[in-house]
Structures are given as C-alpha cells and as structure tokens.
Amino acid sequence: MLAYKISPSSISGRVSVPPSKSHTLRAIFWASVAQGTSIIHHALASPDSEAMIQACKQLGAKILKKSTHLEITGTPHLILPKNTTINAGSSGIVFRFFTALAAIFSEKITITESSQLQRRPIAPLIQALENFGATFSYEGEPYSLPFSVLGPMSSGYTEVIGEDSQYASALAIACSLAEGPFSFTILNPKERPWFALTLWWLDFLGIPYAQSEDTYSFEGKTRPQAFSYTVGGDFSSAAFLAAAALLSQSPHPTYLENLNIDDIQGDKELFFLLKKLGANITFENNTIIIFPSTFSGGNIDMDPFIDALPILAVLCCFATSSSYLYNARSAKNKESDRIIAITQELQKMGACIQPCHDGLLINPSPLYGASMHSHKDHRIAMALSIAAMHASGDSIIYDTDCVKKTFPNFIQILNSLHTNIQEHYEHISLRPADSRQDVVWQGSR
C-alpha cells in the first residue's frame, strides 16, 4: 500500500498540466468506432485509459501505442463476439459507456469490474435502456455487477435521471450508433458541463442530433470518420496545483501550462470562481498564472464543477469567511462518498467542516498534521495532500495508489515545484504531535 508523508511546504515555478482524462477516454472510444485510422496526441496514460483501450480492442479496434500518440484503427464492423466479457476496471466512464454500447448488439455481453465500481449506481441507465428493449440479467442483486446485456435496442423514446451526467452521455453514444431513431429526456439534469463535453464530441465528429430543452433526438446508425485530436490539459487536475499555488508562502507565482481556456471542460469554471472570490489569477495564452493570495468564502453552487468538491473544501478552510458548498449530492456517488470522506479526513486535521443535506458547511480554521486515508479516491488523496502541505506539522495519507487514475505524476510534479513529499510502500506513522486546541463549530445554515 502506497502512502505519502508530507511536510509543510510551498510551491512556485512552471509546470505542464497532464492531459484530460475525460477527453482521453472519449477520444479512444470514438476512434475505436470510427471508420479509418485516427491519431490521438498526448493521451493520458492511466489505469482508466488502459481499461478503455482493452474494452475497445474487444470491439475489434486496433490500437498502437506510439511514443507521442495513439494510432487507432476503428473496428471494420461494429460487432462484439458472442459471450464477450468487458472488464471496466475502476472506470465509471468505461462502465457506463459499455453498458449502453452492449445494448445495441444482438449477442449477450457481460460487464464486470474491479470491486470499487460496485458502489457506483447504474440503475437509471439500465432502466432507460430497458425502455428501448434491451434486457439485463444479474449474477447477484439487481443493478449490481457483474451483469449481462442483450440487445438490440429498438427505436423509441425514454427518460433518464440526470443525477449523474454519465447516464445521459452513455445513452447519447448508444443512440448515435444503434439503428434508430431515438430520443430521450434528461430529468432534473445535473453536471451539465460534463454532458456538454459529450455533445461537443458529437459536434466535433459530425454526428447529428437535435435538442429541445432537455430532450435529445438521434437519427441513429451514424459512425464517424477517422480524426486527429490533441488532448489538452486537465482542468480537474490543475485545480489541485492551483490550490497549492494560492496557499503558497512563496513570493513567486506558479505557471500552469497546457490549459486551453476555451476548452469545454466544466472544471475550468473553478478558476473564474476563485478569481471572483479575490484570488490573484491571470490567463495568458494557454497558461494560467496563480499568485499566492487571500480569498473569501461564499455560497457556492458545486454543480458546474462537482469533481472539485474535495479541493474546494480544502481551500475554504483557508478562506477569510465561511462557505456553503451546495448542490453537491452527486458527489456522494463517485469513487467514494466525497462529502463524508473529505469531512472525516479534514476533521482529523482540525477543520471546522460539517456535511449537510446537499453539500458542506465550512468555517475557516488552521489545519494540523494528521494521519489520514484516501478512501481509495484519487481526488480525496490529492486534496488531502494539498491540505497537508499547508498544515502545521507532518501528515501521512494512506492508500494513495488511486492517484494514478488521473494524475500519475502528481507527486513528481509537486516535488519539482519545491515541495517535500515522500512516497512509502510500507506502513509509516507520525511521531506524537503537539497537542492542539479543540475546534468548535461556529454558526450554521
């Protein structure tokens, strides 16, 4: 089990942000079903990317890993052999996308996973696919992995709950490729920027669809042509570096390169929010410049950048006023229940943080070094790392292998910016720390 030992430290310097996971996975998928050979430059190398690659190879796609790009020849015939098993690994995108894709085939397809995906809900997507005529059978409890899917989907209309954007994204993919026409309505849509990213890919590939408010219609049976695409930097990953730069005691700024501010990624809005709250952030070409600075808290709607909940919770501990992070219920169904996970771990550091029905209440408070756990969630692990860098005393974060999911060189990049983080593969513990004052919650909402 990998653990981080982190001493208080500040960052400054210049760094290239790693490629976007969301764009990488969609690029690999669409190249695998496209007609011809596609080139994907700067794809993120991660366990989720590998899970997508292996799943797409079972479609018949030929995927070659070059030094700077992926060369992907799409499957000549969009079929899956009888009794194919797709292992989604720990990737929610592979899990949801291939569940929907399996529904277009007339052969039984089995979807399986790593144990971590067992907690990720799938029922709303399955129910929508059943309305199109797909059937599902389960080895255990209904709506739990592993399960088998038998299509094909038939044309029609369905509705899907919008709590998680991946349900609608998966439906859009299946409706594009299956023999249609199809239409669906998203009920109470959340995480709109992430579904917008899926629609951006449809537009980029020339796949037709029509939109009327939250209802989407597809002609179906549309395979894109091969394409060339360069994956830009990941704003979700950049958020952790930005937080470290804002809280830094260094007199120098940090330059985050490889970030296209015109990218559709939803988490870029976090940078505009922080600037609005008083953070000293400037945008220059494909670089975001972060100056150490103070900023206020506030009432913050998390839906536009739900993946930023853990790191924004950390930042709010250092704000000049209280914060209410709301509209964040979907964060409970990620790799962990992020509302509970970040609350439990930051409370170990002395944070004034409480969960509420749809988010978090946070009062500014000093943080102290502590022993913490990642909950096997990459965003929790990275958020706690940034908190530990700005706490009083050393900290340990256990079970941090999960960081490879989106940011494989996270520690290497931070240490290149002058931090003091050590990786250990054996059990480590902190020496007894100085006693700290008890923290009392002040105020409520």
UniProtKB/Swiss-Prot annotation:
Belongs to the EPSP synthase family. This is 3-phosphoshikimate 1-carboxyvinyltransferase. Phosphoenolpyruvate binds at residues 21, 92, 120, 166, 338, 379, 405. The keyword Cytoplasm applies. Keywords: Amino-acid biosynthesis, Aromatic amino acid biosynthesis, Cytoplasm, Transferase. It holds the Pfam family EPSP_synthase. One of its GO terms (molecular function) is 3-phosphoshikimate 1-carboxyvinyltransferase activity. PANTHER family: AROM/DEHYDROQUINATE SYNTHASE (PTHR21090), PENTAFUNCTIONAL AROM POLYPEPTIDE (PTHR21090:SF5). It is found in: Cytoplasm. Catalyzes the transfer of the enolpyruvyl moiety of phosphoenolpyruvate (PEP) to the 5-hydroxyl of shikimate-3-phosphate (S3P) to produce enolpyruvyl shikimate-3-phosphate and inorganic phosphate. The gene is aroA. It comes from Chlamydia abortus (strain DSM 27085 / S26/3). GO terms for cellular component: cytoplasm. Its EC number is 2.5.1.19. It is an enzyme of class 2 (transferase).
